[in-house]
Amino acid sequence: MSPNPFRRDVPARAAGTGSSGGRQARTPKGRRASGPGIVQGKQIVVRFARMGATGEAVASVAGREVAVPYAAPGEQARVRILSVERGRARGQLVALQVASPRVVRPLCPHFGRCGGCQWQHLEYPAQLEQKTALVRDALNRARIPSHLVSPAFGWEPPWEFRTQLEAVVGTREGRPVLGFFAWGGGRVVEVQQCPVQHPGNVAALTAIRAAWDALRPVAGAVRGLLSRVAAASGEVMLGLAATRRLHADERHLVVRALLDRIPNLVGLMEVRAPRRSHLLAGRRADLLWGRPHVA
C-alpha cells in the first residue's frame, strides 16, 4: 500500500481535479506561468488564505493562485510547483513552516489516498466556515450580494451523512477492487469503511464484494455501483453499473446473488454506464427487482 500523503512531515501526493480523478493539463517542464516566480518544478514559500472548491488550500503568489492539497488556511509552507494551467498552479507540500490549530487527524484511514473526501483534515466548524465562504465568493463574482448567504448548517455528529454512494470497480492482481478513485488519478482505492457514508451504503458495498464470486459471469461488464439510502427508514436502492445491457439470464443471476445479502434492500437496478464517463447518477436505468425509489 502506498504511503498516506496526509502525513504532513513528507511531501503530499500530486494535486488532482477532484474526486472524479480526471487528468490535468501540464505546462512543459520549466515553463513559467503568467506570474513571476511560478515555474513548474520550482519550490516557493506560500501562505494559504482559503480553501478551494476541490478541497485544496489556495495561496496567492504575485496575483496568481497556487492550490495545494492537505494544507489549511493560515498555514505557511514550502511547496513544489507541479503543474501550471491558465495561470493557476498546483503544488505539493514539501515542508510545513507554520501549522494551523484547526487541523485535525482525519477519522478515515483512507484519507489522503481516496478521492472521495478532501476536507477531513480540517475541524468541522472550519469546514463549514470555508464552505460558506465559497458560496459567498461565487455570488460576489456574479455581483450578487453575499449577505444573502446564511452560514452553512452542519450535521451532528458530522459523520454518516452521505445518503448516496458511487463506487467504482477495478482489478488488482486478478481480484476485484471496489472503492473510489484516488485523488488526481485513475487508480481505484479499495475502501472497506467510510465514516461519511450512511451505514446502509457501506453495507451494500460490502455485499457486492462478498457476492463477487457469484457475480463472476457478469464481472467483466460491471464497472461500478450506485447506492441510495433513505436516512429516516434505512431503505436501500442499489444500481449495478454495466458497460453493456445485461441478458435476461444475467439479470436473474444478479438478483439471486444480491437479494438476500443487502439489509433493507427495496430496489435493484441495472444502470447503463459506457466507459467514456465515470459519472453514474442520472443515467438510464432498468428495474431488475422491487421498486425504483426509497421512502
What are these language model-derived features?
Residues 2-295:
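Accessory RNA-recognition modules of RNA-modification enzymes
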